[in-house]
């Protein structure tokens, strides 16, 4: 059976143009429409390759979008132009222009995964081991998309089919139901991807395990969170039993980093001027040498938190730009190297999952399980890498959880929306944002969930708006 795909180099972006669908996404203007059939081995391989371009290179949310949008939702980053003022000041509504990106992009990924899974079912054109690898990848991408949807919007339509007659009128499913589907997809992916031999820039069993550990943490299944994290963490100092090790601060985001569990190869900027050769994410956030400002810059609250301990090596992840009038702009500097494909040692990858998170997942779950020493040990792994002294504070539950929150903030700022989701899942959003200088005026508790885009409400009568946004 043939289907229309949008071909980008060797990959595809599925075009979802039906006005009756829950999605209404225009194809890229530079796309070349072609027939790709699932009846050939090459067609299936091309479709599977397309997941990576669609999700990690051309997706309006996953590649740069999480950093651009979600870093402004939380207390991390501001934009100099007024375009995103509503984001950083938490004054968005259902008609805000950027909200659909955070909804449509994940659903585009989900639709693609569903369509792929449906049309390779029973296929005999590839060896079962290879087909299982592609199925596992599709399940991972579906789980990954739903993870962000449920953490940004709460209850969302749960779609496991590409049938527009179903998707067009699907109601919202509870967060519990969505998380159950995420867990199911990841458990299947672990099995299907076993012994697939995928590298760190392709979905693997370890990538599914890393995301599953995070999901178990978010759903407060502490024993399971520890169990999954243990599969990735070294069993003893030196790394026995693990393929991953914490890297030096300057090497965390390099393509050769042993800390990386999953990453996407970045494309260099090929335009003209002083940005030529920088990775795409560096091109967006690093100020031009001649600029008198940074277009996107960190808020004082974040800078003060990271620099509270001057010896903390994570200060290197914050760049400085002296602007007009002597104003200092602090900007993201985790991705800063020129793209040099002939020198892999200095080539950066866009990191999606890394080992440091697994230490802090195990630490947090261990606190809730009463395994205090394990929690302290894991906290100290992160502190030690940052050149900080061992944790010497109280080992009371609340104090340890606050230390973990602090380390997560300093470790994962400007990464994958961690800070926004951390404060929401722990119930700390109100306490923090109500005291943040540029957020406290507009902050209301209901804003911890984003509004469902108004065009989706108008298109699907089964959808209801999140509380608080009905009058906006």
Language model: regions and residue ranges:
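Short, surface-exposed recognition loops and adjoining beta-strand edges that mediate ligand/DNA contacts
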Residues: 32-34, 62-81, 195-281, 392-398
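Elongated scaffold/linker segments in the mid-to-C-terminal portions of large proteins
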Residues: 83-84, 97, 234-371, 426-472
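Acidic, glycine-rich segments characteristic of secretory precursors and extracytoplasmic regions
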Residues: 19-68, 460-472
């Amino acid at each position: 059976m043939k289907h229309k795909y949008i071909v980008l180099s060797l990959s595809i972006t599925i075009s979802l143009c039906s006005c009756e669908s829950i999605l209404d996404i225009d194809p890229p203007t530079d796309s070349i429409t072609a027939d790709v059939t699932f009846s050939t081995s090459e067609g299936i391989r091309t479709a599977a390759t397309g997941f990576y371009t669609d999700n990690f290179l051309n997706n309006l949310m996953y590649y740069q979008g999480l950093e651009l949008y979600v870093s402004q939702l939380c207390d991390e980053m501001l934009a100099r132009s007024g375009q995103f003022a509503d984001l950083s000041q938490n004054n968005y509504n259902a008609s805000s222009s950027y909200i659909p990106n955070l909804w449509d992009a994940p659903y585009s990924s989900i639709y693609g995964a569903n369509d792929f899974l449906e049309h390779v079912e029973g296929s005999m054109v590839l060896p079962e081991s290879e087909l299982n690898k592609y199925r596992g990848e599709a399940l991972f991408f579906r789980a990954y998309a739903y993870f962000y949807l449920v953490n940004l919007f709460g209850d969302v339509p749960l779609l496991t089919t590409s049938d527009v007659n179903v998707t067009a009128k699907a109601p919202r499913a509870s967060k519990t139901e969505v998380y159950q589907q995420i867990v199911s997809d990841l458990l299947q992916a672990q099995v299907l991807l076993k012994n697939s031999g995928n590298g760190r820039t392709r979905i693997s069993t370890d990538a599914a395990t890393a995301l599953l550990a995070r999901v178990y943490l978010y759903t407060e299944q502490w024993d399971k969170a520890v169990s999954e994290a243990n599969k990735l963490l070294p069993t003893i100092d030196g790394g026995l039993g693990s393929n991953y090790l914490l890297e030096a601060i300057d090497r965390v985001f390099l393509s050769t980093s042993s800390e990386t569990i999953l990453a996407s190869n970045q494309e260099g900027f090929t335009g003209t001027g002083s940005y030529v050769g920088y990775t795409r994410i560096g091109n967006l956030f690093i100020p031009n040498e001649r600029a008198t400002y940074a277009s996107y810059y960190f808020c004082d609250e974040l800078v003060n938190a990271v620099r509270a301990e001057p010896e903390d090596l994570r200060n290197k992840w914050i760049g400085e730009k002296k602007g007009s009038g002597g104003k200092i702009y602090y900007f993201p500097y985790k991705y800063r190297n020129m793209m040099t494909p002939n020198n892999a040692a200095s080539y950066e990858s866009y990191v999606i999952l890394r080992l440091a998170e697994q230490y802090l997942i195990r630490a947090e779950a261990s606190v809730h399980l009463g395994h205090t020493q394990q929690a302290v040990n894991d906290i100290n792994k992160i502190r030690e890498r940052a050149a900080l002294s061992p944790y010497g504070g109280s080992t009371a539950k609340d104090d340890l959880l606050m230390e973990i929150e602090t380390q997560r903030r300093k470790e994962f700022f400007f990464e994958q929306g961690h800070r926004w989701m951390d404060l929401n899942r722990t119930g700390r959003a109100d306490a923090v944002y109500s005291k943040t200088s540029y957020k406290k005026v507009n902050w209301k508790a209901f804003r911890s969930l984003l509004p469902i885009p108004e065009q989706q409400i108008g298109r699907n009568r089964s959808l209801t708006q999140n509380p608080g946004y009905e009058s906006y």
